[in-house]
Curated annotation (Swiss-Prot):
Region described as Disordered: spans on this chain: 1-40, 117-137, 197-260, 326-371, 421-507
Expression (tissue specificity): Expressed ubiquitously in vegetative and reproductive tissues.
GO cellular component: DRM complex
Protein name according to UniProt: Protein ALWAYS EARLY 1
Ranges of compositional bias, category Polar residues: 450-470
Main location: nucleus
Protein's GO biological process: DNA-templated transcription
CDD domains: SANT
Regions of compositional bias (Basic residues) in chain numbering: 1-11
Record keyword Metal-binding present: no
Biased composition (Basic and acidic residues): 209-219, 332-350, 424-440
Domain SANT: 40-98
Pfam families: DIRP
The species this protein was found in: Arabidopsis thaliana (Mouse-ear cress)
Length: 971
């Protein structure tokens, strides 16, 4: 087996004796170090010496001999160097930063610190001598008569050298644990040893000592090393004893006549029987009450209370407690115990561990009477917790169960009740309810005690709740019995609840008052009338608008002045959608969104620069509109532009922002200036308001004419689209090409090419002949419609962004390219030589109005390009989608049936012609770059095999575009 583990605190008390020496040694080392530094520094430096030292140091830096000679007054080189080492950091600063005054202040502070440390060292030495002298003291040993009950305390080292500490330790029997260096030196109360000493000490001396200790603790304001110890002795039990003792001494001036008998009873105890804990469980509070009364007898102080009736009642209680066994039975009755527990309901926070063990020995001396009592109540007794409802037929509880229940973690006082008549049981439950009500009102203890009469018989009961209040101080008679019908509805017996906190009570009261006010509000006659939906919404809106933040948000969201409304009503994105005929579309496809994004370009980042630019634009717009309004007022024949709102005039009703409160108010315009106007508010008088803070009362009347027409047009388009919408289509809203054709654009785009229209139709026909699946046919039609819409959208976007001159170049180039490709295809299909083919191309160009002859090198190059693209795209005939790549078979002679990519050839020729046209004349670089983007988009092939060539073309065009954009001026 492993050896027995030894206690770690065997020799702990010797460490306390050695610790002062260690502290003294460390203090002495610090003192020696300071003395050594002071010796090097020499005598205290005067101000003149410091001034001379500073001047010499600035003059002879590092030459300490010259500095010492300049200082004079027998200052050695070592002293001067020591002074420099002490203030090295300060003296190293530049001459403008450091000064003589700073050096003098630092040395003055140094000397003051040295003086303070020396005075503290002297006090420390004196305390060490006192501690060593008092260390040899030992507490007085108790007489031999007490050694059987009291464990001899350990020898405790004196803390801070106070003899009264040892006296208090011996008197109240506090044991100090063996502690280490860092353990706080305050005493811990030992309950059972304290009670043993109190049992064998006279009650009058013990009470006087306790009162003296309490008085000293109350008078001591702080700073004493024993404050924590004295505060630990002031437990709730002792405070309760002291207050009750003072109260009892005034009520019983002649209580000294009982002192001898009480002292005899205390001295007759001897060795206490530990089995008295069982009786304490049965009559715990009765025993506690008896001890409180005896402490009250031993007191000699008087209180200020002059309640004579209360004094007589307390005297009756004391006489009942000293009565023989005849009255002991009535004291142990459940009714009397319930009264005791109710009187001390606010003092029951202590558990059984805090109850003194002297209560056990106090009842042990009356063993004969207790045995008789146990035999008398063994048959009908019952025991139950207070939370369990009381039953009439009680069961007998064994002694083992009582002991087991007393060993709980947080035990409660459990009383062995005696079966009483029905009236007593009901009275007890009624009195419990009454006590709970009184306790919740926080009434004084003596008021509750004065309202309760002693129960001298088992059939004693109280009358009504009103007769037992604090104001009514009558003693209820023994014959007053409460009828059974009055207390039948009182329910089971419950423990009175803890009094609530006053702060929570005030909070509950305030909440109750608010609830009452709400009830009063709802109890008005209008609350019975059911509000309509309109009135309910109006009330909610009024409540919402009562918040300032909501009103500010409404101003930012909906308040627009007459001068700013056209500017903010114009949205570039909405204008673009209306221009291409998609302003009425609630949803767009992915292809449409991609086209829109590519057309609008890259958006600007939301930054401070962007916001500042927008503000500058708005300010310029405002100034231009104000200038136009001023000219319009000066000239009677002036015409208002269709994109401007009608200006405000005198007498118009407006909604204006008050310049002081920044709240919206109704008003009327009195005068109009360039950018301000005088507004007469309905309730706030006349104020000068900016024109941007005035909104017409009816904004529709001041709307610009152009904006009004645009809104009407959008509404008409939306109405038409709503009528033409297919009811069964739940996917993306698709519009037929007729909708796009009916839209009147400002710039007429070129009609869709024949290949673009023919290609989806042919693709649908091929799929319809190869399969009979109806869903595939529908999908092909949908795809064709989307492609057609996308092409029209591209042409529209190009026409919108480019200048008219650039648009003419694009149209002319594509027309020439289409004629050349058609002539070349016809010539190739006819099988004639190169000269005949060239003649056919010239004829085609002359037919479309082209008067410039082409070089001979152009046509062979075009023809070579045609056959090259044809040979490249010839491999795509065997793919899964041959018709989707834009191939159209040219039916000529039966020998040559090679399909020709006419669309791609036309785009290439048109691109070449565009580049040739813009090179003949100088155009703006931005327009040229935009035209090149159009060329690159037109060259995009549909065959995947041509994508590498397209990437090369795209790269080359990007380089050219970058060089052109470098010529664009940026402001």
């Amino acid at each position: 087996m492993a050896p027995t583990r030894k206690s770690k605190s065997v020799n702990k008390r010797f460490t306390n004796e050695a610790s002062p020496d260690i502290n003294f040694g460390s203090a002495s080392k610090t003192k020696q170090r300071k003395k050594k530094l002071a010796d090097k520094l020499g005598p205290q430096w005067t101000k003149r010496e410091l001034v001379r030292f500073y001047d010499a140091y600035r003059k002879y830096v590092g030459d300490w001999k010259k500095v010492a000679a300049a200082v004079r007054n027998n200052r050695s080189v070592e002293m001067v160097e020591t002074l420099f080492c002490m203030n090295r950091a300060y003296l190293s600063l530049p001459e403008g930063t450091a000064s003589v005054a700073g050096l003098i202040a630092m040395m003055t502070d140094h000397y003051s610190v040295m003086e303070g440390s020396e005075s503290e060292g002297e006090d420390h030495d004196a305390s060490e001598v006192t501690r060593k002298h008092l260390k040899r003291k030992r507490p007085q040993v108790l007489p031999s008569d007490f050694r059987e009950e009291v464990v001899p305390p350990h020898s405790v080292a004196s803390v801070e050298g106070c003899l009264s500490f040892l006296k208090q330790t011996q008197a109240y029997e506090k044991r100090q644990r063996a502690t280490g260096k860092r353990t706080p030196r305050f005493l811990v109360a030992i309950t059972h040893e304290r009670d043993d000493i109190e049992d064998f000490s006279p009650p009058n001396k013990r009470a006087k000592k306790q009162l003296d200790a309490d008085d000293d603790a109350s008078r001591r304001g702080g700073g004493s090393p024993y404050r924590r110890k004295e505060l630990s002795e002031i437990t709730p039990t002792r405070l309760r004893k002291t207050s009750q003792a003072q109260e009892a001494q005034f009520k019983h001036p002649d209580s000294s006549m009982f002192e001898n008998g009480v002292r005899d009873r205390w001295h007759k105890k001897g060795a206490a029987d530990r089995d008295g804990a069982l009786l304490m469980d049965m009559e715990g509070l009765v025993t506690q009450k008896e001890k409180i009364v005896r402490v009250e007898e031993a007191e000699g102080n008087y209180s200020d209370d002059d309640d004579g009736l209360g004094a007589l009642k307390t005297l009756a209680e004391m006489s009942a407690s000293l009565a023989p066994a005849g009255l002991l039975e009535s004291e142990s009755s459940p009714h009397w115990e319930e009264e005791r527990k109710t009187n001390n309901v606010d003092k029951k926070s202590n558990t059984l561990e805090t109850v003194s063990t002297s209560h056990h020995r106090e009842k042990a001396k009356q063993a004969g009477l207790e045995d008789n009592l146990l035999h008398a109540i063994s048959a009908p007794d019952k025991r139950k917790p207070k939370s369990v409802p009381e039953s009439v037929d009680g069961n007998v509880v064994s002694i083992e169960e009582l002991r087991t229940s007393s060993r709980k973690r947080k035990p409660k006082f459990q009383v062995l009740d005696v079966v009483a008549p029905k009236e007593s049981t009901q009275d007890k439950s009624l009195y419990t309810k009454e006590s709970a009500e009184v306790d919740s009102l926080k009434t004084p203890v003596k008021a509750r005690r004065s309202s309760q009469g002693p129960a001298k018989q088992l059939k004693t009961a109280k009358t009504t709740v009103e007769s037992s209040s604090a104001s009514d101080k009558k003693i209820t008679g023994p014959d007053a019995v409460v009828p059974a019908t009055q207390v039948s509805a009182s329910g089971p017996e419950t423990l009175p609840q803890k009094p609530p906190n006053r702060r929570k009570i005030s909070l509950k009261k305030s909440l109750q008052e608010r609830a009452k006010s709400l009830e009063t509000t709802h109890d008005k006659p209008r609350s019975f009338k059911k509000l309509s939906e309109h009135e309910l919404l109006q009330e909610k809106l009024s409540n919402c608008l009562s918040y300032p933040l909501v009103r500010r948000w409404c101003i930012y969201e909906w308040f627009y002045s007459a001068i700013d409304y056209p500017w903010f009503a114009k949205m570039e994105f909405t204008d673009y959608l209306n221009h291409v005929g998609l302003g009425h579309a609630p949803r767009l496809t992915r292809v449409e969104w991609s086209v829109i994004k590519s057309s609008l370009g890259r958006p600007r980042r939301l930054s401070q620069r962007f916001l500042q630019d927008e503000r500058d634009k708005l300010q310029e717009y405002r100034e231009s509109v104000r200038k136009h309004y001023t000219e319009l007022r000066g000239c009677a024949t002036g015409v208002l532009h269709t994109d401007l709102a009608r200006p405000l005039s005198v007498g118009n009703r407006v909604i204006a922002i008050h310049p002081k409160t920044r709240e919206i108010r109704d008003g009327k315009i009195l005068t109009v200036d360039h950018n301000k106007c005088n507004v007469l508010f309905d309730e706030l008088g006349v104020e000068l308001v900016m024109d941007i803070d005035c909104m017409p009362l009816n904004p529709l009347e001041y709307m610009p004419e152009g904006l009004r027409r645009q809104i009407d047009k959008c509404l008409a388009i939306c109405k038409e689209a709503r009528l033409n919408r297919h009811p069964s289509s739940d996917a993306s809203v698709l519009f037929s090409p007729s909708v796009l054709e009916n839209v009147n654009f400002s710039m007429n785009p070129p009609p869709a090419k024949q290949d673009d229209i023919r290609e989806p139709v042919l693709y649908g026909k091929v799929i319809a002949t190869n399969t009979t699946d109806q869903s595939i046919v529908i999908n092909s039609k949908v795809t064709g419609t989307e492609i057609q819409r996308t092409l029209a959208l591209q042409h529209t976007s190009d026409a919108q962004e480019m200048e008219p001159e650039m648009i003419e170049i694009v149209i002319e180039s594509k027309s020439i390219a289409q004629a050349m490709v058609d002539a070349a295809i016809k010539a190739a299909s006819s099988g004639k030589n190169n000269e005949d083919s060239e003649n056919m191309v010239h004829q085609a160009l002359s037919s479309i109005g082209e008067h410039q002859p082409l070089d001979n090198s152009i046509v062979p190059g075009i023809k070579h390009q045609e056959y090259t693209n044809g040979s490249l795209d010839h491999h795509s005939l065997n793919t899964a989608e041959p018709m989707s790549n834009g191939f159209i078979s040219q039916e000529g002679s039966g020998k040559n049936k090679t399909p020709m990519p006419s669309e791609l050839i036309t785009s290439c020729v048109a691109s070449w012609l565009m580049m040739q046209m813009i090179s003949k004349k100088q155009y703006p670089p931005a327009d040229v770059a935009q035209l090149m983007d159009t060329v690159v988009n037109d060259l995009q092939p549909r065959c995947p095999q041509n994508m590498p060539i397209y990437r090369e073309i795209q790269t080359c065009m990007g380089l050219i575009k970058t060089q052109i954009m470098a010529l664009v001026r940026t402001s």
